[in-house]
């Protein structure tokens, strides 16, 4: 079992390579493999196209080595990257309420600048975005498609790199490096289980490699199966997940009911709850119209809501299969081939939902119809199926394919060249249940069911036949596809000599073509009225659907970089990239300096510009999602899920940013390295979809706020726009300390990120310094429910301590997230139950023990471990009708124990 070093250069060229270090990423904890005396590997590192042997830390970097990956106990990439201190506001934990479409995916959000602002690479090559879209309109590369069985390390460049890589590398780059030139066969399997709730997860992995001096093949495969964990196992997470739309009625005239469950006299616009609200699993609440709102005897009453929270999962039942292979072949000493092929199939198999969604048409029921006992018309505020019905499922299925072919060569002059063609695609299917609106209307008037003569009663669920319910029900289907084709060509070598050494140089060109399509089944597809141009709503009571889309575009780029050894201790690197987009063009430079101030001290600084072009989704997409909103006009703190209709725009401009980084690397001993960096991003024309809650708060009766005739909220229209600016800065600190001793080898690693500020424009008066819609607000340390920023705890820290002696290894990992605030008004009743503006700080501990031994000619390792071993609950948060914790930063699963075995043949 080994990974061979394939490309070597004479040791005398090491000094030349060190002088050529440009925007290179120093690979912490990775040493250059020396094969024979006088030979050392030459590598191309993330952030540069100039080959170099330098390990000097010219750029801010964090590297997750293979050893760290093993110590983490992570089964998939999302679990690994979710704990990065430099990532804030990513979506790696399942959440049906605020990231329903992205379930089963994972991503990275460097600096909290948005999922779209982090460039994800696989072996230095671009990967297609997933076809899933986040609630805020973000698109991203699904990192869960990265095969863990083949993952060697993760390199994280924590500064803008548009000058090298082009669009999207605004906040930085995450480069997943996969195994190649592996020899032998390695089998591993593991099982983990949540202590409280019993949901298990197991995986099978196989890694194999074989070859000769010229040709080598590496193959990997894995299977992962996850059992579900219902939110009912964590009651605190859903205690506020209550809809105001359960089963209630609003009288449209004064009247009464003589006998039966609804007997009594009612005034004008009085809310009447389900007569058996509590018995039917409902949640009593205040009426829709305040008492006396339209004069004496009007309004009042109480409604019957629906507690939907326990219906949903915290963890869904999922299965994932992955295959990956690469082939390398040396045609000669000056020409080599690398080919890769990868495939991931991922299914979310259950994903339970509410029995049915509420009817946002709010039907009016006349006396004598739909089983109404009232003598006057009433408006129905509710859902066809409630607590008496089972939960339908909303599965998701995704296939991702990636293929890459690369040729590397050398000219007689010593210059190198690289040409590559990479293709990747994602095909995603999403199912979601709903009720057909026209059929419900027919059934309410007595013309429903297969025979056309059945009546649906909202007053007595037992009166509705299974055949009628099936006739009303509909399973929506959405198929979204993305693909990306990239052609790269790069040349690199020594340009000319300076007194301190040669000038390293690289130049190249890139062509990209991407496409995005979305199609839905018939009833879920919106259409356009040819006469007015208006969107015709779909024939469903709740879900809004979307328009079909099939768009593509291409771009071209030219780039160059050079590294100048100004003196024996000072280097300057200059890079520039020109990109010709389908809608615009951009020139982005980058200047970085590295000064070896002393043997133990490196000072570094960089300044660059960056850009990101609007995604095809942001430009062309039009669809409707569901969001839980609190209506300030209702006078209630309760939330209800309504349609949020988002509209893309062809007028969007690219986002631009100016980035700065200053840092120092201290190496007082060979075993201790300490790094500190100050970073700053000035981000302009940030593309975002309008925040529906913020828009509702700013103007509850605006033109884009949709209400029925009684004023009940049913939808909000939002648009993509270049309306925002972000200025953020902070401090990164990392440290590595190796302590050899007679008792074994001790290792300590620390990674911390602290936001000094995260400033965005004010839109309305709030408690974050805004007095109106002018000026800026600092949203670092806030949950940010009412603006486009995601939740931003000011400080995140990861620390690892490990001890190795003989065949034994113990690792302790600590993860800390600082407290932050909600800014949301909390009802007095919830304050009495312990809710507050503060979201508590959170620290969890993971522990792992491994023992290695031989079984004949087989190397074996047994690993036992625990995650969150002190069983810390996710901090409590009031987020209206959503989960009562922040899934962007906290994990409610609690304590998890696991065991693994690995066999190397």
Language-model features: locations:
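Surface-exposed, low-complexity loop segments enriched in small/polar and acidic residues
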Residues: 135, 229, 239-244, 279-318, ...
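N-terminal Sec signal peptide and the immediately downstream disordered periplasmic leader
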Residues: 1-85, 146, 205, 209, ...
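Extracytoplasmic beta-strand/coil segments of soluble accessory domains associated
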Residues: 81-126
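C-terminal beta-barrel architecture of Gram-negative outer-membrane proteins
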Residues: 626, 752-764, 768-854, 879
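N-terminal periplasmic accessory domains that precede
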Residues: 77-80, 108-109, 141-144, 168-189, ...
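C-terminal beta-signal and adjacent terminal beta-strands/loops
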Residues: 437, 756-757, 813-826, 852-905
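Short acidic/polar hinge/loop motifs at secondary-structure boundaries
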Residues: 125-158
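Short loop/turn motifs that connect adjacent beta-strands in outer-membrane beta-barrel proteins
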Residues: 36-38, 181-184, 197, 214, ...
